[in-house]
Amino acid sequence: MENQKILVAKHAIDHYIKSNMNLGIGTGTTIYYAIKYLSEKIKSGSLKNLKFYTTSSDTKYLLSKEQIPYESNFSKLNKNLDIAIDGADEILLEKKSLIKGMGGAHLMEKVIAYNSETLLIIADETKIVKKLGTKMPIPIEVAQNAVGFIMTRLEEMNLEATLRICKEKKGPTITDNNNYILDVKMHVENPEGTEKYFKLFPGILEIGIFNHKNTRIVYYQDKQIKEA
């Protein structure tokens, strides 16, 4: 799968990323390869004057390691970014709907994605599903003081929700925004409706279902790179 990630990352960057763009950079294993390749193109001079806006502390670390300057303060931005490039945990090709958030950064990933003209997703073949929720739970970022209320509400809906635990710290996972994450097991019949519905719950900051109006997907399947 690692080779597939490298191939789709290179294809996406070669075909979509141009000099002088403002780019949002997501989080995850596929983005690692995208950052490595972006670094090569910047150092060779084939890409110039790019501005990078990050979605997580992990991404900041990777960019710093490649000596790529980045912006983490979005308060002065008054227009959309050109492209947000990111990976996905599950992809429903027919609707271009996604599950993201297994890395715990989906709130800022969505802020960046939904304030970009294009959301460019890169993925290996394991991420393609026929229904969202098939392989992965739906991540929900929740205010710490609201987690009990939200879990009760989900139980009343007959949904199984688990508080994500950080193995290293032996306690609940804390996001970069100082919130908790609930992983909810459910098959998503209506991605857009589900995203909107859960955002109505007081205490839910964000749900890891993405339905960007202009999503481009570069993925590997049947031994070749495809686009949707």
From Swiss-Prot:
Supply the alphabetized keyword list: Isomerase
Cross-referenced InterPro entries: NagB/RpiA_transferase-like (IPR037171), Ribose5P_isomerase_typA_subgr (IPR020672), Ribose5P_isomerase_type_A (IPR004788)
The family note in this entry says: Belongs to the ribose 5-phosphate isomerase family.
- Matching Gene3D superfamilies, A to Z? 3.30.70.260, 3.40.50.1360
Q: Does the keyword Isomerase apply?
A: yes
Q: Which GO terms describe its molecular function?
A: ribose-5-phosphate isomerase activity
What protein name applies here? Ribose-5-phosphate isomerase A
**What does the record note on quaternary structure?**
Homodimer.
Report the catalytic activity: aldehydo-D-ribose 5-phosphate = D-ribulose 5-phosphate
Instruction: Return any one Pfam family short name.
Output: Rib_5-P_isom_A
Q: Which GO terms describe its biological process?
A: D-ribose metabolic process; pentose-phosphate shunt, non-oxidative branch
The answer on whether this UniProt entry bears the keyword Plastid reads no
* Biological role: Catalyzes the reversible conversion of ribose-5-phosphate to ribulose 5-phosphate.
| GO cellular component assignments | cytosol
Gene designation: rpiA
**Top-level taxon:** Bacteria
